Amino acid sequence: MNNHPNLLAQLRAVNQTAAFNQWCGIDIVSAEAGKVEIAMPWRPDLGQYSGFLHAGLIGALIDTACGFAAVTVVGSVIASHYSVNCLRPAVGERFIARARVVKPGKSQVFTACELFAQSGDGEKLVATGETLLLVQPGK
């Protein structure tokens, strides 16, 4: 994914204002029109009782990546609906969410995301998701 420095800097600035994203350790890795990659390191306090990444954080990563991907095309958005498919236990040293805009519109944007667990043996797809976002005119 090619980085566009101004776009990447803008998204990182927005990300810095989101307290939840900062608490999780979410970073914007790369951005271009319609595509964003974010990452979050594993910490034990992000896990559920079996030691896997909590499904709530899986959803948060997918929602966040999709939202940022939509922002690169239409500006300010708010999530209307999202769905998550957990494919396997999310175990890794780092989690990478890659989102893309599927269909932009004047009032809504459809996005899709894949979430990978990264560890010493590479990346494994752990979840997929889709988000429907509403365009926030004038913001």
Regions found by a protein language model. Give the residues of each.
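Non-catalytic linker/capping segments at the edges of enzyme domains
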Residues: M1-E37
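A generic structural signal for short beta-strands and their flanking turns/coil linkers
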Residues: Q22-C24, G34-V36, S76-Y82, E93, ...
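HotDog/MaoC-like acyl-thioester-processing domains
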Residues: N2-N3, P89-G92, I96, V102-K139
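Hydrophobic residues in beta-strands and at strand termini
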Residues: M40-W42, C86, V135
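Short loop/turn positions at the edges of beta-strands in beta-sheet-rich folds
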Residues: S30-E32, W42, V74, V91, ...
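Hot-dog-fold acyl-thioester-processing enzymes
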Residues: Q16, P41-D63
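Hydrophobic beta-strand-centered segment that forms part of the acyl-chain substrate-binding groove
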Residues: G67-I96, V101
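Short, aliphatic-rich beta-strand segments
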Residues: G34-P41, A99
